[in-house]
């Protein structure tokens, strides 16, 4: 089952992006839309909330047919985290359940990456990434004993974008395409 909030978010995000706003406007206006969505924890279908015992899950919720944006439910099992990685596009992270620690990395003159301070996202809060300002980070579930869920929105189909993980000590990149763990997406029009 889907919930009207998900459909409303997709419609509003689509309307905004069709106007071709500048990235700072996308991040500001998109963050407001996403904050409204994650303010309520009653719309995400249960099948997109299931953790995996070994690694985080990336469930596709929506992918715009023109690649204007995609929307993903990230489900973090206890203690799970990403490697240091980039996105190659803008992104918004809305915390739905639990807590997540977002740690940005800063490229140094020698090519290595220096770890910055982590920011903890609480339910209802929204963070962002952008190649223009802060694209390289590591994300971790704050909790060691329970799952957390965040809703991510990206400027393109993130599951098809060629991105990179980095060795922070050397800066050495390794290319990857994340894909998705689900084979079906929510029916936005079925209430």
Enumerate the predicted regions with their spans.
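A short glycine-rich, His/Asp/Glu-containing loop-to-beta-strand
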Residues: 50-78, 126
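Conserved short histidine dyad/triad with adjacent acidic residue
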Residues: 72-86, 132-134
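Glycine- and acidic-residue-biased ligand/ion/polar-headgroup-sensing regions
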Residues: 87-103
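Short acidic-glycine-tyrosine-enriched beta hairpin
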Residues: 107-136, 179
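Long hydrophobic alpha-helical segments typical of transmembrane helices together
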Residues: 169-191
């Amino acid at each position: 089952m889907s919930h009207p909030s998900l459909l409303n978010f997709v419609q509003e995000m689509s309307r905004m992006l069709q106007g071709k706003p500048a990235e700072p406007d996308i991040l500001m206006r998109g963050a407001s839309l996403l904050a409204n969505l994650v303010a309520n924890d009653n719309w995400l279908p249960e099948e997109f909330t299931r953790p995996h015992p070994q690694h985080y899950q990336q469930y596709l919720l929506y992918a715009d047919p023109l690649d204007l944006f995609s929307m993903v439910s990230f489900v973090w099992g206890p203690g799970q985290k990403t490697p240091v990685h980039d996105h190659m596009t803008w992104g918004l992270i809305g915390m739905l359940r639990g807590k997540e620690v977002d740690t940005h990395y800063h490229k140094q003159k020698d090519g290595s990456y220096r770890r910055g301070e982590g920011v903890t996202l609480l339910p209802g809060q929204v963070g962002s990434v952008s190649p223009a300002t802060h694209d390289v980070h590591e994300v971790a579930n704050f909790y060691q004993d329970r799952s957390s869920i965040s809703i991510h929105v990206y400027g393109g189909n993130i599951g098809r974008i060629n991105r990179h993980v980095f060795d922070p000590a050397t800066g050495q990149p390794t290319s990857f395409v994340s894909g998705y763990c689900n084979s079906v997406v929510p029916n936005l029009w079925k209430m």
